[in-house]
């Protein structure tokens, strides 16, 4: 089995960054230190990660500048694609991140405020460089504004938008983004498994690749995410604290007939 776009499924460690250190909490709260960012990134590169995600978990809410120096240092030592997000507000922000060594840039809060920003970014740098990060949480069903039952949030999940998360993912794809980073704020950090229903809904709404994020806690969680429609699986604490390795996840997927690199 290949991903929805016919490619091998990617395994992506996510490095949530606070003040230059890798941290992981539950729902972006109660953050605890998980290690030096560049050191971890190099270890994941050697271990066989297909890509790395750097997410500044404070940038959007505190207005801090994006972590250019961290990206530069990491890009000098690792040779797999780097996706960077957090605090990206303008086309110029994307430009400096790509010049610093990022391969893809993830956008969330700024795009909610000005959706046409996605088209501007994709038009200037190419769809393959722009990822729409959708931090979605469950809301009561029956709402006319959020018919899918999931709402897009901003500022690390602290602010609701009233925008339907599935519809927002589809709009982002229409505006030219090359990928959707779909993060369940309900599942994030809980290790209870990915939100499979949300994955299926977004997979049915878009043709671009979808990265499943939020909830990975056991080896049994990854194969269902792929069968639900994920083209890539992203996890943080299970990798940082050595509860699982990249190799174990790839072996489990390969045993289930899923193509991995």
From Swiss-Prot:
Keyword annotations from UniProtKB, A to Z: Amino-acid biosynthesis, Cytoplasm, Histidine biosynthesis, Lyase
Enzyme class: lyase
SUPFAM superfamilies: Ribulose-phoshate binding barrel (SSF51366)
Subcellular location as annotated: Cytoplasm
Family: Belongs to the HisA/HisF family.
Function recorded in the entry: IGPS catalyzes the conversion of PRFAR and glutamine to IGP, AICAR and glutamate. The HisF subunit catalyzes the cyclization activity that produces IGP and AICAR from PRFAR using the ammonia provided by the HisH subunit.
Subunit (UniProt): Heterodimer of HisH and HisF.
NCBIfam families, sorted: hisF
Name assigned to this protein: Imidazole glycerol phosphate synthase subunit HisF
Originating species: Mycobacterium leprae (strain TN)
């Amino acid at each position: 089995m290949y991903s929805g776009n016919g490619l091998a499924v990617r395994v992506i460690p996510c490095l949530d960054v606070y003040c230059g250190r890798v941290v992981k909490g539950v729902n972006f709260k109660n953050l605890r230190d998980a290690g030096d960012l560049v050191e971890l990134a190099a270890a994941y590169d050697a271990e066989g990660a297909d890509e790395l995600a750097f997410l500044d978990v404070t940038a959007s809410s505190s207005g801090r500048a994006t972590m250019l120096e961290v990206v530069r240092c990491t890009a000098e030592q690792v040779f797999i694609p780097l996706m960077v997000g957090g605090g990206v507000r303008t086309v110029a922000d994307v430009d400096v991140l790509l010049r610093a060594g990022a391969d893809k840039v993830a956008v969330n809060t700024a795009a909610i405020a000005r959706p046409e920003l996605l088209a501007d970014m994709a038009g200037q740098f190419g769809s393959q460089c722009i990822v729409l990060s959708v931090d979605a949480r469950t809301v009561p069903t029956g709402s006319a504004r959020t018919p899918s039952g999931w709402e897009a949030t901003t500022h690390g999940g602290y602010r609701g938008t009233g925008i339907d998360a599935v519809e927002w993912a589809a709009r982002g794809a229409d505006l030219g983004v090359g990928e959707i980073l779909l993060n369940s704020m309900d599942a994030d950090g809980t290790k209870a498994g990915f939100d499979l229903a949300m994955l299926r809904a977004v997979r049915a709404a878009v043709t671009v690749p979808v990265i499943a994020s939020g909830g990975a806690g056991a080896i049994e969680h990854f194969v269902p995410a792929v069968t639900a429609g994920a083209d890539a699986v992203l996890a943080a604490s299970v990798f940082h604290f050595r509860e699982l390795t990249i190799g174990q996840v790839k072996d489990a997927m390969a045993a289930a007939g899923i193509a991995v690199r």
